[in-house]
Amino acid sequence: MFQREFEFTLPKGYLDSDGNIHRKGVMRLATAIDEISPLRDPRVKSNPAYATIIILARVITRLGALSELSPMVVENFFAQDVSYLQDFYRRINGLENETTVPEDTTNSSEPLVHT
C-alpha cells in the first residue's frame, strides 16, 4: 500500500482569531478533481492564482486543532507558508520534475498546476 497522506510543519503557522498558532498538518495526495474543480470557481476565473488557495484547502486534511480548513482560512496563511505548501504539494504529488518554464515567462501568481 502506498502513502496517501503526508505530515508537514508550516514555517510560520496559521494564526487563528483566538491567537492560536497552528503549524502541524497533514496533506493528502491530489486527485484529478482537486485540480479541475477550482477551474469552475468564479474567483479563479477572475484571478487564476486563486486556484492555489482552493486546491490547498481541498488537499490539507488537518491543520493543528482546526476542525475545518476552508479557502477563507488558506487566504490568511502567511506568504512563506503558502510557498512552503506549494513546494510540498509538488513534491508529494511528483510534480517537481515537470518541464521548466523559461525564467522570463514565469509568474509568481500562477496556480499550482499548469493547465
Regions found by a protein language model. Give the residues of each.
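Short, surface-exposed, charged amphipathic helix/loop patches that serve as local interaction elements
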Residues: 1-115
